[in-house]
């Protein structure tokens, strides 16, 4: 089978109005993909930027996949959360990006968004925190239901990904 190695890190995030940020991440693939090593999801530590608005996580990603075809190419999805001084967490943004299909090192910037909700939910978010969240996580990367949401732009998640492709020519998989 053809193999894909995804090695890199979630560098951090910038452009969020909230501070004390952390990120929950995961990777979604099609049915023809098999994870040989690594973990499909994880969470970074909380970082509060001291200078500027960049929260640094330097969270490693190391995944090894085998595949029979290109359909269902891996997509990384993110949930960025902020934590207040009482330890309460509220959603700062959702985002996703496709893993690049060409080998080499890639710098990625993944824009995020969050659902707005009704004016009452927006008012409650401003005063007591919280706010609307997605019921189904796959809405982040599947566009079928996403177009109906009213959203607000969030910040950007920054990644550095190295991609290695192996045996694609031997098994007739063309990139």
From Swiss-Prot:
Signal peptide boundaries: none
C2 B9-type domain ranges (all copies): 2-118
Phenotype when changing residue 155 to S: In JBTS34; uncertain significance
Record-level Gene Ontology MF annotations: gamma-tubulin binding
Location of this chain's protein in the cell: Cytoplasm, Cytoskeleton, Cilium basal body; Cytoplasm, Cytoskeleton, Cilium axoneme; Nucleus
Cellular component GO terms, alphabetical: centrosome; ciliary basal body; cytosol; membrane; MKS complex; nucleus
InterPro entries: C2_B9-type_dom
One GO term (biological process): cilium assembly
Pfam family membership, one: B9-C2
Keywords: Cell projection, Ciliopathy, Cilium, Cilium biogenesis/degradation, Cytoplasm, Cytoskeleton, Disease variant, Joubert syndrome, Meckel syndrome, Nucleus
Subunit details: Part of the tectonic-like complex (also named B9 complex). Interacts with TUBG1.
Entry's family note: Belongs to the B9D family.
Biological function: Component of the tectonic-like complex, a complex localized at the transition zone of primary cilia and acting as a barrier that prevents diffusion of transmembrane proteins between the cilia and plasma membranes.
Disease implication from the record: Meckel syndrome 10: A disorder characterized by a combination of renal cysts and variably associated features including developmental anomalies of the central nervous system (typically encephalocele), hepatic ductal dysplasia and cysts, and polydactyly. Joubert syndrome 34: A form of Joubert syndrome, a disorder presenting with cerebellar ataxia, oculomotor apraxia, hypotonia, neonatal breathing abnormalities and psychomotor delay. Neuroradiologically, it is characterized by cerebellar vermian hypoplasia/aplasia, thickened and reoriented superior cerebellar peduncles, and an abnormally large interpeduncular fossa, giving the appearance of a molar tooth on transaxial slices (molar tooth sign). Additional variable features include retinal dystrophy, renal disease, liver fibrosis, and polydactyly. JBTS34 inheritance is autosomal recessive.
Protein name: B9 domain-containing protein 2
Species of provenance: Homo sapiens (Human)
Classification lineage: Eukaryota, Metazoa, Chordata, Craniata, Vertebrata
């Amino acid at each position: 089978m053809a193999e894909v190695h995804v090695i890199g890190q979630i560098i951090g995030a910038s452009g969020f109005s909230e501070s004390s940020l952390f990120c929950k991440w995961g990777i979604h693939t099609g049915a023809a993909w098999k994870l040989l090593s690594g973990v499909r999801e994880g969470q970074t530590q909380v970082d509060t930027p001291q200078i500027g608005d960049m929260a640094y996580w330097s969270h490693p990603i190391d995944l090894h996949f085998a595949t029979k075809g290109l359909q269902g190419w891996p997509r990384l999805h993110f949930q960025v959360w902020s934590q207040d001084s009482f330890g309460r967490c509220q959603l700062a943004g959702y985002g996703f990006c496709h893993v690049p299909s060409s080998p080499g090192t890639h710098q990625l910037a993944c824009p995020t968004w969050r659902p707005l909700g009704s004016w009452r939910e927006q008012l409650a978010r401003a005063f007591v925190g919280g706010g609307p969240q997605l019921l189904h996580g796959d809405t982040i990367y599947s566009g079928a239901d996403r177009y109906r949401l009213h959203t607000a732009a969030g910040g950007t998640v920054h990644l550095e990904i190295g991609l290695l492709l192996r045996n694609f020519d031997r098994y007739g998989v063309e990139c």
